[in-house]
Amino acid sequence: MLRQARPLVVLIAVTFLVASEVFSMALASDQNSNVASITSQVQRLLRTHHATIKVNADSEERFLTEPPLTTDEMMAMMKAGKSKNAYAFELGIAGQMADFINSGLPDIETFKKTPEFQKYEFYMNFLNDMRKDDDYKPLVEMIKKNKGETEAFKTLLVKVEDSVSKKKASPSAIVKLDPLNREQAIVEKIELALKKNQALNKNKASLETIEHTVRMAAKSKPSTWKIFKIISRLKKLKLKR
């Protein structure tokens, strides 16, 4: 009896071992598949993130070289007494902005990338920066109070422009650069220096001359990569002539 039962026990044991091995292999295969799936997802995420960074970098590069508005345009709007809210209506985005504020719609990030909103934001930042200027602060304060179209604003504008003109004409006046348009002012100074250098000795302006002009224009040694990029670009343009 025992002899007959022994082969059966061995068969059951072998069957159990084989089943266990198959189950282990299947489990390992599932785990490997899950790991591979997760890894693929992470890699796709990294590729997407990298692509997003590249797109954002390209957008920032275009923004640095192609601002939504020029300083002259924004200065003209400010002197006309135009508020940021009035400009939003002019751009046709006032209603959308109100909807985002009241409803918190999910596609607000897409809206913020539109040319209209970028112009609005650029002008808003310009007004905030001009508010820090002692000369133009009273004008901006009146604009914020929706008094930009009043006679009082026009009278104040005449006084401000007269005061600014006198300061610019004074030889001892300290040049104050608008933080929003600092690089543009520096470029203008550099271009003027290049023209003077050409008139004096007909030689190509040296990099040292350009750097000195930048320091004089900015009242400090340039430390941002944007300023050095401007210098490099002007230098290359100069050498091509």
UniProtKB/Swiss-Prot annotation:
Annotated GO CC locations: extracellular region; host cell plasma membrane; membrane
Subcellular location as annotated: Secreted; Host cell membrane
Motif stretch (RxLR-dEER): 44-62
Keywords: Host cell membrane, Host membrane, Membrane, Secreted, Signal, Virulence
Endpoints of the signal sequence: 1-20
Induction comment from the UniProt entry of this chain: Expression is induced during host plant infection.
Main location: secreted
Transmembrane as UniProt keyword: no
One Pfam family linked to the record: WYL_3
Family assignment from sequence similarity: Belongs to the RxLR effector family.
Function text: Effector that suppresses flg22-induced post-translational MAP kinase activation in tomato but not in Arabidopsis. The perception of highly conserved pathogen- or microbe-associated molecular patterns (PAMPs/MAMPs), such as flg22, triggers converging signaling pathways recruiting MAP kinase cascades and inducing transcriptional re-programming, yielding a generic antimicrobial response.
Domain notes for this protein: The RxLR-dEER motif acts to carry the protein into the host cell cytoplasm through binding to cell surface phosphatidylinositol-3-phosphate.
Protein known as: RxLR effector protein SFI5
Gene source species: Phytophthora infestans (strain T30-4)
